[in-house]
Structures are given as structure tokens and as C-alpha cells.
């Protein structure tokens, strides 16, 4: 059996800064052919995108896929809502999570796995300003420790 490859195309770095990621889940996505070609070319942005459950189905909103240059009439709207592919049990679990106060679904990354486009969704809770400052302070402290250790081993 072939090894599963995971080639990350786009990441939502802002999501990890703005939210506490409680859990992640992998979902497929319904796309047209020209959208897949644009994603292969890396022309996708997850900035300001989010996912939500509507009528028992999960959709992603605000995900920008640039039109494919050679696609002409087959290109779709770059910001259209796109359906995510999940099992019913997974959707029910997501509904339970996002009905809790302060919880939301945030796309973390888009990647290819065995030739199929996948999205990693994070079940997230928003950070307050002081939480963000705390994370930045921790990161700076770790960076300083690494710098000092590197100097000592020279």
C-alpha cells in the first residue's frame, strides 16, 4: 500500500493566533475542475474564512480560490460557499461543539492527500487580547532561551 502523502497548499496562520484550537477534523470539499487546478497552483486563501452547519450540511464561507487563467467560462465565483464532505456522525458531533457558547469552526489548512483536496477544520474558541499577549511573551521567551543555548554551544 502506498504511503499517504500530505502536501500543504495553504495555511491559516491567523487562526492559531486568534483562537484556541480544541480539536481538529479532516474534511473533503466539493470543487469544480478549475478550482482544483487553481489550488494546485497555490492560489487559495483562508484569510477571514470560517465554516458553519446549515441544514445538516457543513459549508465553508469566505475561502478565496483565484480563477484559473485558462479556465475562461468554467471559472466559478472566487468567494462562493463550498460544501464540505463529512460523515453524518461527524456533522452531529460538530453541531454539538459549535452550539456551545464561544465555539466556532475555523479552517486551518488546505492540502492534497492522495490527489484529493482536503481541509483541516479546527473546533476553536476565541482568544482574548491578554491571551494573545501571553502567547507572544511565551514565544519570545522560548526564542531567547534558544538563542542563549546556541551561544553557549559555540
Curated annotation (Swiss-Prot):
Subcellular location: Cytoplasm
Molecular-function GO terms, alphabetical: RNA binding
One cellular component (GO) term of this entry: cytosol
Coiled-coil ranges per UniProt: none
UniProt keyword terms in alphabetical order: Cytoplasm, RNA-binding
Biological processes, Gene Ontology terms: trans-translation
Any matching Pfam family: SmpB
NCBIfam families associated with the record: PRK05422.1, smpB
Job description of the protein: Required for rescue of stalled ribosomes mediated by trans-translation. Binds to transfer-messenger RNA (tmRNA), required for stable association of tmRNA with ribosomes. tmRNA and SmpB together mimic tRNA shape, replacing the anticodon stem-loop with SmpB. tmRNA is encoded by the ssrA gene; the 2 termini fold to resemble tRNA(Ala) and it encodes a 'tag peptide', a short internal open reading frame. During trans-translation Ala-aminoacylated tmRNA acts like a tRNA, entering the A-site of stalled ribosomes, displacing the stalled mRNA.
Family: Belongs to the SmpB family.
This protein's name: SsrA-binding protein
Amino acid at each position: 500500500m502506498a504511503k499517504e502523502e500530505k502536501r500543504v497548499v495553504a495555511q491559516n496562520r491567523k487562526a492559531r493566533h486568534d483562537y484556541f484550537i480544541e480539536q481538529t477534523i479532516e474534511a473533503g470539499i466539493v470543487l469544480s475542475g478549475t478550482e482544483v487546478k487553481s489550488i494546485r497552483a497555490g492560489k487559495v486563501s483562508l484569510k477571514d474564512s470560517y465554516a458553519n452547519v446549515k441544514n445538516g450540511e457543513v459549508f465553508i464561507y469566505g475561502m478565496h480560490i483565484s480563477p484559473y487563467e485558462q479556465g475562461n467560462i468554467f471559472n466559478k465565483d472566487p468567494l462562493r460557499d463550498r460544501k464540505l464532505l463529512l460523515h453524518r456522525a461527524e456533522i452531529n458531533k460538530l453541531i454539538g461543539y459549535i452550539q456551545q457558547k464561544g465555539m466556532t469552526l475555523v479552517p486551518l489548512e488546505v492540502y492534497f492527500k492522495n490527489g484529493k483536496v482536503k481541509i483541516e477544520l479546527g473546533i476553536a474558541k476565541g482568544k482574548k487580547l491578554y491571551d494573545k499577549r501571553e502567547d507572544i511573551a511565551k514565544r519570545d521567551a522560548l526564542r531567547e532561551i534558544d538563542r542563549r543555548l546556541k551561544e553557549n554551544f559555540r
